[in-house]
A protein has these predicted regions:
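Active-site cores of enzymes that catalyze phosphoryl transfer or operate on phosphate-rich substrates
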Residues: 6-7, 11-124, 171-235, 247-349, ...
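Single conserved hydrophobic/aromatic residue that forms the stacking wall/gate
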Residues: 2-13, 373-386
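Short acidic, glycine/serine/threonine-rich loops at helix termini
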Residues: 48, 130-133, 160-168, 244, ...
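A conserved nucleotide-sugar
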Residues: 354, 362, 368-375, 379
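N-terminal alpha-helical segment
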Residues: 129-130, 343
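Active-site-proximal binding-pocket segments
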Residues: 127-129, 143-173, 195
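Alpha-helical support elements that line or immediately flank enzyme active sites
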Residues: 93-97, 132-141
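Substrate/cofactor-recognition hotspot
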Residues: 236, 241
Length: 386
């Protein structure tokens, strides 16, 4: 294992320990590396422990372990927000430091970092990687602001996943300043230069205020991403249009070439080939196995849309999978599920903006619809929804 020195979170979080998982490619000799991080206390205070102050000696270790114990816990209170921010910065700092170290070992310079490395900001959680790379270039490597900013803005790309205002991540300036003061000062400098440039070009204070990265004593992480990244995309055509016409309208009008659409999908060899053996067998039988390397091959299924035999087999596969899941739930939790019901599943944290309550109301509405239109009498209905 390698140890990487962290900065910005104090002595408690001195050590960042990487743990690597190797992921093999499909029908190839390629192996990718997935690097995870664990926080550890740099040094155990044996002197304090020997003096009998066990609680204080161990408290630093407990706090350190909390950073990577549970990712993104509930943040509807001050402690949760602070821990979440510390987690974000810890992971960003560890990853940026690792990227820089590996690049330096090969090229001996960061002048060409943006030509050899692409860093993807997938939603706003890793946004602190932007000012962290600036910090490394400015403080550790002695780059000028303009040169460092050129490297940063040509290295990062941003994918936006939501346009709901309440889901666009914002951090309180006081909290950000207390957790990682140097990073906060870099963000403020980025914003001041950005707003100055906007004012010189538009002479419109309302526009400048709206496009500012800092507003109402909060740092708008999505706005920072849009400003600092050379590419900004939504995950569906309609989503990308909303980004351009509503959410980031002024930013789009200012830098239209960086906005694009990249339609989301699934890793189908993972979530189809590996996870759904029955469906994979049916697909291979009907259209061959070409879809395992080319997803466009799945369009060949269209000819079977009215094929009763195929539809019946598909229904059986779905039922078999539900039975398999119900068996797992019973064995693990002792809960019996009705496999004739519709399974409505959300792998999401419970939060207002996730709309779980709205989804629950929809389930009730569909249930009432089934009672009303699919049964001679509501008492005879066997339709339900999990």
């Amino acid at each position: 294992r390698d140890d990487v020195e962290s900065r910005g979170l104090g002595d408690v979080y001195k050590r960042q320990v990487p743990y690597d998982l190797f992921v093999s490619g499909y029908n190839s000799e390629a192996v990718s590396k997935l690097r995870l991080w664990k926080a550890e206390m740099a040094d155990f205070d044996m002197s304090m422990f020997n003096q009998g102050d066990y609680q204080k000696a161990l408290s630093k270790n407990i706090i350190s372990q909390a950073i990577t114990k549970v990712l993104y816990p509930n943040d509807n209170h001050a402690e949760g927000k602070s821990l979440r921010l510390r987690q974000q910065y810890f992971l960003c700092a560890a990853s940026i430091g690792d990227i820089v170290n590996q690049h330096m070992s090969v090229y001996g310079t960061l002048d060409n970092l943006h030509e050899k490395v692409a860093i993807h900001i997938n939603d706003t959680h890793p946004t602190l990687a932007i000012p962290e790379l600036m910090r490394v270039l400015l403080d550790d490597c002695g780059y000028s602001w303009d040169k460092a900013w050129h490297i940063v803005t040509n290295t990062f790309a941003y994918t936006n996943h939501t346009v709901m205002p309440e889901a666009l991540e914002k951090w309180d300036c006081n909290l950000l300043k207390s957790v990682c003061p140097r990073i906060f000062s870099i963000i403020i400098e980025i914003n001041e230069r950005y707003c100055k440039d906007l004012w010189e070009r538009y002479k419109d204070q309302a526009k400048v205020s709206h496009m500012s990265i800092v507003e109402d004593n909060k740092v708008k992480m999505a706005t920072l991403c849009v400003h600092a990244c050379h590419s900004v995309n939504g995950v569906a055509k309609i989503h990308s249009e909303i980004i351009k016409k509503e959410t980031f309208k002024d930013e789009y009008l200012d830098t239209p070439t960086k906005f694009k659409n990249v339609t989301n999908g699934i890793a189908y060899r993972r979530w189809l080939y590996q996870s759904n053996e029955g469906l994979t067998d049916l697909l291979c039988e009907k259209i061959g196995d070409g879809f395992l390397k080319n997803a466009a091959e799945l369009s060949k299924l269209a000819v079977f849309k009215d094929d009763k035999d195929v539809l019946d087999r598909l229904a059986k596969i779905k039922l078999d999978n539900k039975k398999s899941f119900a068996k797992y739930v019973k064995n693990q939790y002792g809960v019996v599920l009705n496999t004739d019901s519709i399974f409505d599943v959300q792998v999401k944290r419970l939060h207002e903006y996730k709309r779980q309550q709205l989804n629950a109301l929809n389930i009730i509405a569909q249930y009432n619809y089934c009672l009303l239109y699919t049964s001679p009498s509501p008492r005879d209905s066997t339709s339900s929804r999990m």
